[in-house]
């Protein structure tokens, strides 16, 4: 369902899930990250496309399991043949008209054996031919029509090559590996998409917190300008100082405007990711960045979860499983092809169509056959090299799995180290912000006493804005690192209580 086709009822249902607030004359929906992720799972077209891919892979398994369906073949034929021969009594022969009905039922079993039944009904009538010379042939008497009925039971048993359920169920196993791959690819893509949306969300948080800080800077600049204008009118301040205050105010207002424009762009990114290009309200992130120190577990348990959850390792294991199946296929090709074909036939004759079936119980008309055939693959270098190739590829995948485990361990160490560094940086940024705020307040007091200038105040004001901006960035980076850890460990769905894990 495309966002453009949202009905008023659907928009109303979405609005009921949020709280509204006014911000700069604009209606804003306060949205926590949990709700954003829930809507992403419900509406993102990319996730819906992934579900179709998984469903398509599952249908291939059903098809592979039903590959050995029974087969019924029926044919009807008519033939006429004539022949002449020469004898001492003259030239003569016969002409035969035949109608043949054949029906065969066969099925291959999952263990490689094939059985079947064939019923044949043949109705014939012969006419005698005489020829006074070879150029003139005439028919004489016609014999009575008769029918021949036969029922055959056939069984083919492979002993080495193509024998057993393990070999014959290889198509099912390959299809099941395909399902595993589709599910893992879907899981990886889904987590990547959710991580991307969450990262955009935290960017939006950073921008709106910066907007609030910039509003404070604008308020300070406005108050400072009013104070300076009042002091100028009282003759206590030069016009240059007032002009400097006006310049700082314009600079702060311009920065605020740029931040608001940036917020709209990032908000558009969120709505595009959620497949909601048209909404009657804006989006305001209600979550605040946190340190999450209580959510961090010990490195050993985190590494264990990461290794269990990593889709690259799981995909490599699925690839290794498929290589093992392909090795079985090559080994099966190199096996001796030894087959036993058994057949037992019942026959009956009658002057009436299908009347011969009543004679099937006559053992004198029964027949049987047994054929043992075998073939040895001599010098099949192609299959041998193919088998060697699959063994080498299996070993390659095993090494790739170990390499990925080592990579994840280093990545976890890097993330945990970044947590410690970010926490220290955040404490430093907070301390710098407090000092910058004190310095700004002191400088404003000195300005009122005529011991400072508006330019110096603006410099301290910019220092405070930069330090607070750094504090916001540190907190947001902490959230993004924590988000990466949730994705790696497979805890994203559990942490935000999301459906459909």
Protein language model annotation of sequence segments:
Residues 183-305, 418, 422-425, 463-465, ...:
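Periplasmic alpha-helical coiled-coil/stalk elements that build and connect Gram-negative outer-membrane
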Residues 2-98, 155-170, 174, 285-321, ...:
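Bacterial Sec-pathway N-terminal export signals of envelope proteins
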Residues 232-239, 447-451, 488:
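A short glycine-centered flexible hinge/capping loop motif at secondary-structure junctions
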Residues 48-53, 65-66, 110-134, 141-145, ...:
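Sec/SRP-type N-terminal targeting helices
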Residues 439-479:
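C-terminal structured "cap/appendage" subdomains that terminate the fold
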Residues 24-28, 76-153, 285-296, 327-332, ...:
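Small/polar, glycine/serine/threonine/aspartate-rich low-complexity segments that form flexible
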């Amino acid at each position: 369902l495309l966002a453009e086709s949202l009905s008023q009822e659907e928009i109303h249902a979405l609005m009921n899930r949020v709280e509204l607030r006014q911000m700069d004359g604009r209606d804003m929906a306060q949205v926590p990250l949990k709700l954003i992720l829930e809507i992403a799972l419900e509406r993102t077209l990319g996730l819906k496309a992934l579900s179709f891919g998984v469903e398509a892979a599952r249908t291939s398994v059903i098809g592979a399991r039903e590959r050995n369906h029974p087969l019924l073949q029926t044919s009807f034929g008519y033939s006429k043949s004539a022949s002449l021969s020469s004898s001492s009594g003259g030239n003569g022969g016969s002409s035969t008209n035949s109608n043949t009905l054949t029906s065969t039922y066969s099925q291959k079993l999952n263990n490689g054996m094939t059985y079947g039944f064939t019923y044949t009904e043949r109705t014939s009538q012969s006419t005698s031919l005489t020829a006074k010379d070879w150029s003139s042939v005439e028919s004489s008497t016609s014999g009575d029509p008769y029918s021949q009925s036969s029922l055959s039971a056939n069984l083919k048993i492979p002993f080495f090559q193509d024998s057993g359920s393990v070999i014959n169920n290889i198509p099912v196993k390959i299809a099941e590996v395909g399902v595993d791959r589709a599910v893992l690819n879907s899981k990886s893509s889904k987590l990547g998409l959710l991580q991307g949306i969450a990262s955009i969300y935290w960017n939006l948080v950073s921008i709106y917190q910066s907007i609030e800080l910039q509003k404070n800077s604008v308020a300070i600049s406005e108050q400072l300008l009013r104070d300076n204008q009042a002091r100028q009118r009282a003759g206590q301040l030069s016009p240059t100082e007032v002009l400097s205050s006006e310049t700082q105010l314009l600079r702060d207002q311009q920065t605020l405007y740029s931040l608001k424009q940036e917020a709209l762009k990032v908000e558009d990114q969120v709505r595009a990711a959620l497949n909601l290009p048209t909404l009657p309200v804006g989006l305001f992130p209600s979550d605040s960045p946190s340190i999450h120190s209580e959510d961090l577990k010990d490195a050993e348990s985190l590494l264990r979860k990461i290794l269990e959850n990593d889709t690259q390792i799981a995909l490599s294991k699925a690839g290794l499983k498929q290589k093992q199946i392909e090795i079985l296929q090559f080994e099966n090709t190199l096996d001796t092809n030894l087959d036993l074909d058994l057949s037992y036939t019942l026959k009956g004759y009658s002057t009436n169509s299908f009347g011969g079936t009543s004679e099937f119980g006559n053992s004198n008309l029964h027949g049987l056959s047994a054929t043992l055939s075998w073939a040895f693959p001599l010098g099949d270098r192609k299959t041998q090299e193919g088998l060697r190739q699959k063994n080498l590829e299996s070993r390659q995948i095993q090494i790739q799995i170990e390499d990925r485990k080592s990579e994840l361990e280093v990545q976890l160490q890097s993330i945990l180290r970044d947590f410690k560094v970010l926490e220290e940086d955040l404490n430093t940024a907070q301390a710098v912000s407090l000092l910058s705020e004190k310095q700004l307040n002191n400088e404003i007091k000195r300005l009122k006493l005529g011991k400072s200038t508006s330019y110096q105040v603006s410099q301290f004001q910019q220092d405070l804005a930069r330090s607070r901006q750094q504090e916001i960035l540190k907190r947001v980076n902490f959230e993004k690192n924590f988000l990466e850890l949730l994705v790696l460990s497979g805890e994203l769905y559990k942490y935000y209580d999301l459906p459909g894990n």
